[in-house]
Amino acid sequence: MADHEVWDCERRFWLDSGNFYKEQVAPDAVLVFPIVGIVDRAAGLAWTRKTPRWTQVAFSNRIFSYAAETAVLAYEAHAEAAKTAHAYYACCSSTYVRVRESWMLIAHQQSALANIEQQLTERGALSVFFNS
């Protein structure tokens, strides 16, 4: 099993549009984000469509685990958005399940490694979520 397929999916979740999210997130997915909290697929998709996308992301301290058509990723992320000079740092984990020929995200969790309110406010994401 080549882990690069799953890591490529993960990178696209950070960088691509809401269309990728809509296609690759499982219907019953559970997502956990700083400030926002626990959300389902619909709420996650709505938030993704309203917030500026990241323009760069780097993963470090990567861990990959695979068993029975399920893949788990754990890593530290460093992301940057085009509209700000500020970076976002988080510890993350994602769980994917293989459905036919593609990987579907079933769970994702982020824990910010710095002041999350400041990070999201600078990116414009905090006001987008709470003013929707």
Regions of interest found by a model, annotated:
Residues 1-24, 28-132:
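A beta-strand edge to alpha-helix "cap/lid" segment located at domain peripheries
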